[in-house]
């Protein structure tokens, strides 16, 4: 995940852009930080999904097949 300083900088640039236009350098920095944030978020979300098992009230595994396949592929990588 991104450091707190990077998250603060993302918010600082977002707030500044609402008040005044960003410079070209600031716009490039904002884009780079947002890309890094999205990569970290997606990676974290994927890790969470790879550990999920869905069961109904009766205890039957109802995890979608697509997710089961992705989990199996992930296990085989390691």
Swiss-Prot record:
Gene3D superfamilies: Helix hairpin bin (1.10.287.540). The keyword rRNA processing does not apply. Residues 63-78 have a biased composition (Basic and acidic residues). InterPro entries: DUF896. It comes from the Bacteria. Its main location: cytoplasm. It is found in: Cytoplasm. Keywords: Cytoplasm. Residues 57-78 are annotated as: Disordered. GO terms for cellular component: cytoplasm. Belongs to the UPF0291 family. This is UPF0291 protein Exig_1097.
